[in-house]
Structure formats: structure tokens, C-alpha cells
Amino acid sequence: MNARTTAGVATMLGSAASNQIGAAVGAHAFPFIGPAGVVAVRQVVAAAVLLPLARPDVRRFTWPQWWPTLLLAVVFATMNLSLYTAIDRIGLGLAVTLEFLGPLAVALAGSRTRLDLLCAVIACLGVYVLVLPGSSSDFLGIGLGLLAATCWAAYIVLNRVAGARLPGLQAPAVATSISAVLYLPVLLTLHHGGLGYALIAGLLSSAVPYAADLIVLRFVPPRLFGVFMSVHPVFAALAGVALLGQVLHVHHWAGIALVVMANALAVRSSRPRDERTIDAGRTLEGRAIAGG
């Protein structure tokens, strides 16, 4: 790798670390304001970052532009709440790993190659090893993690539609703002305890990764960016252990490794014409607009 690519890789790793450290910091606010409170604050921070950049003129939006934007708002609101509630129930590393099945499913959708089939098998095996279903399993937490994955997949598909009808970041900016408005009832009932944690989480998981992603794509190819996105579950697990005192057993690490492997292989094997579409969805979601 040349110096520019090396700098880009370092920035990507820093962005991933910031994102997951932010999620861990946000978890410290759960006892005070709950997952919904953290999500509410984070959505406000994300909207504050995106609106000045996109500067959308909503008065000129047509219905074909509005409907995917409104659906994006619902997806953002649901994805965040399901992810952060899953983090509260099953831990950061497990929740983020399950969430990553969403973009993986989109990357593999419609594929017929043997390698992509292998990726799907590895991912399914990874999830089974990760959760090892049993009488003590938190199936609600697992279900919420999978709901977050479904929302992320829906985001990628909807963003393709909205991106074809609205230039730049207008659709995500408006959708994030609407999502923040949906959480106004939660914001109005929050007390001051834990707000500092939530604000720091919003900055580390929204503003910093978003700015980093914009810089990174100037230095590294989209496919390399997609591969390095695969480190998020690992960083999430490490942040959970270091900052939240969460305990991960051997089967957890094995499951995370399998999902990361499947995701990286899927991105590396994607056809060149698919690169921009797949990775644009991940980038714009930016680990900044909505998901953890």
C-alpha cells in the first residue's frame, strides 16, 4: 500500500474504533435514560451534522421523492432502537455482529456463485455459533439484533431509490431529521442524568465516523473500504469487554470471526459494477446517519 492508502486504512480503523467506543459510552447512559433516550439524543446529533451539509429544500420535494425518504425515517428510528435495546440485552459485540448480517444479505442477494453461497453458509454457521440457542438464550435480544440487520438491509435498498431521486445527502438528512422528531416525546421526558454519555455517544458514533468516511473514500478503493467495514463487530466486542465489562466466551469470538470472514469475502468477491452500490449504502449509513 502507498502512503495515501495507508493513511486511509488508519482513518478507517480509527473511525470504526470511534463508532464502537461511542456505542459503549452510550450504553453507560442506559440506566438513566434507557436505550430510547440514547437513540433520541443520537438522532438529534446526526441531524445536526447532516442538515447543514445537505441543505435540502423540502418545499420542492415531490411524492416520488418523499415516500422513500419517509420510509428511511421509519427505518432509521427502528434500526437504532432495536440495535441499542439489543446491546442492552445481549451485549455490544453480539448485537453489532447480528446487525452486520443486513448488508451481508444485500451483498449476497441474487448471487449464484459458489463463493457467495459459501459466504452465506459461513454467516449462518457464525450466527449459530455466536448465539448457541439454549434455554438461557435471550431470544428477544437476538431477535432485536436481527431486526436491526433487517432495517440496515432495508436502508441500503431504500437509499438506492432515494439517491436516484434526490441529489447528495438530502434524503438521509431529511429522514434523520424526521426520525429525530419522532423521538421528541422521549427527549421531552429525559432528565439530565446520563445526557453527557448520550451526547458523547452521538459525537463519537455519528459526527466522527461520518467525517472520517468522507475523507477515507478519497484515498482507498470502495472494495477495500467494504472489507475494512468488517472490523466493526470485532471492535464492538473489544469495546464491550474493555468499557462495559462484558464477558465473551470462546464461541462468541468464533461466531464473530465467522461473520466477519463471510462479510469480507462477500465484499472482495463482489463484481466491480456492484461495488459502488453496495459500499455507498454502507458509507452513507456512514456509521453516522443511524446504525451503530
Regions found by a protein language model. Name each.
Residues L13-I21, V25, L53, L70-T85, ...:
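Hydrophobic alpha-helical transmembrane segments of multi-pass membrane transport proteins
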Residues V25, P31-T78, L101-V106, C151-L158, ...:
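Transmembrane alpha-helices of multi-pass small-molecule transport proteins
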Residues G37-A47, F76, Y84-R114, A148, ...:
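Specific alpha-helical transmembrane segments that line the substrate/conduction pathway
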Residues S230-G292:
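C-terminal-most transmembrane helix of multi-pass membrane proteins
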